[in-house]
């Protein structure tokens, strides 16, 4: 995971704890979770749109592009 070991992750968590305090951590985690959920949703929507665009390509274009390869 990003080339970080266990010690580095523990150090980062301790620094976050010192900066924000124990009371703010649940709020930060909740916000981070929501942000990641929205990011994954947007990513899947983009993938679906790209797949639809590829699937909607007429057969002639697919054949001509595969013949060029």
From Swiss-Prot:
InterPro entries: TatA/B/E (IPR003369), TatA/E (IPR006312). Residues 48-69 are annotated as: Disordered. It comes from the Bacteria. One of its GO terms (molecular function) is protein transmembrane transporter activity. One of its GO terms (biological process) is protein transport by the Tat complex. Part of the twin-arginine translocation (Tat) system that transports large folded proteins containing a characteristic twin-arginine motif in their signal peptide across membranes. TatA could form the protein-conducting channel of the Tat system. HAMAP family: TatA_E. Forms a complex with TatC. Belongs to the TatA/E family. This is Sec-independent protein translocase protein TatA.
